[in-house]
Amino acid sequence: MEIRSGDELAFRRVYQEVFPTVMKVAYHVTYNQDVAEDICQDAFIRFYDKDIEFPSMDDAKFWLIRVVKNLAINHVKRKVRETASLEKFMKGPQVNPFRDGQTEVILQESTAAVRKAVSQLPEIYRTVIVLREYADLNYSEIAKVLKISESNVKVRMHRARKELSAMLDREEVNVP
């Protein structure tokens, strides 16, 4: 099935299928719901306006994920330069009324520490972590998005997890 940008019917199908995934990517790079929605909207406008033919739905999906990832990273870099900190973009998890207070505090602290550590990873490692853990892409899909080999994705993922683990160990963070 061929998908041509500018085709309203194809656009609607792509939007319905791909929006949840790109929204996860944008949110887990920016940690801001409104910004993530704006980034996704911008990416879909570019998709619609761009004169590109995609051989399949997957090709359109990977193109959109790549655009959203780049827009989100650029947004964060811009904000970091302006504020010199990602901390205000990181929201803690919502309180679960079924957990006791101590468990909730530990979970919130652990989640904040992991997010902080992920934000401090080099971009090539942070990107594979976000695409795998938050966008739920498999290694071959990540390879297509990043235009690298699947084995390179595995190497980056291994190094990212190793570096993330070392960062959390240095901070003495126990992840439940």
Please report, for each region that a protein language model flagged, where it lies by residue:
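Structural recognition of an alpha-helix C-terminal capping motif at a helix-to-coil junction
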Residues: 38-45, 49, 58-70
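A short pre-motif secondary-structure segment
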Residues: 128-132
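Short amphipathic alpha-helical boundary/capping segments
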Residues: 1-2, 113-121
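Internal acidic/polar
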Residues: 74, 82-111, 138
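Arg/Lys-rich amphipathic alpha helix in sigma70-family domain 2
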Residues: 55, 66-87, 107, 159
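C-terminal flanking helix
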Residues: 19, 23, 44, 122, ...
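DNA-recognition helix of helix-turn-helix
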Residues: 69, 73, 140, 145-170
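A short, charge-rich alpha-helical start-of-domain segment used by transcription regulators
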Residues: 1-24
